[in-house]
Amino acid sequence: MIITVTLNPSIDRTISMPDLKIGSVNRCELISVDPAGKGVNVSRALDEFGVKTYAILVCGDLGAEWFDRKLDEVHIPHAIVHAPGITRNNVTIIEGHGDVTKINEPGITLSKDVINDVKDSLDAIEIKDNWVVFAGKLNPGAPISTYKDLAEFARSRGAKIAIDSSGPEFKAAMEMVPDLI
């Protein structure tokens, strides 16, 4: 089984329109709304290929029920760690001529209690001899050692570790020498 940990999931809205006119009212032709964030996307892709997966994600109080319902609809087993705040929303605007504009919110702040709840979620399932994937950009204000610390925790329970991130948090996570990057 491959367990994904998404600390900063998003509700992704994709909007199609012929032409985005800045400073004007724009009418869209098509909209889709999907559960996302790198780890969630990994679990969705694994599930599509028939690979057993389990998603652990941190959601703000506003957005947690939506994620729970959406992941249930696609039959992805999951645990949602609740945090104060609003789960981030990302908007992608696709214009008829091919231009793509993305607007990504920063996400919620993670407290030590929330990180401990993520560890509890890892302890609640069998991670020994399974893969744990830590994926995505860290939340604003999170210590850069967050992925490293969580990965060391998972490894101490016998998990194999994959890291999919960038920037200082990725560099810090490399100190624990993950099994896959």
What does each model-identified segment do?
Residues M1-I56, E65-W66:
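Glycine-rich phosphate/adenosyl-contacting loop at the front of the ribokinase-like
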Residues I3, Y54, A79, V133, ...:
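Structural detector of well-ordered beta-strand residues that form the stable sheet scaffold
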Residues V5-P9, V58-D61, A83, G96, ...:
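Cofactor-binding loop segments of dinucleotide-utilizing enzymes, especially the Rossmann-like FAD-
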Residues S24, E48-N130:
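Conserved N-terminal subdomain of the carbohydrate kinase-like
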Residues L30-G37, I86, T109-D113, S145, ...:
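Residues at secondary-structure transition points
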Residues R44, N116-D123, K148, K171, ...:
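Amphipathic, non-transmembrane alpha-helical secondary structure
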Residues A45, K70, D149, F153:
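Rossmann-fold NAD(P)-dependent oxidoreductase module
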Residues W131-I181:
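Conserved beta-alpha-beta core of the PfkB/ribokinase-like small-molecule kinase fold
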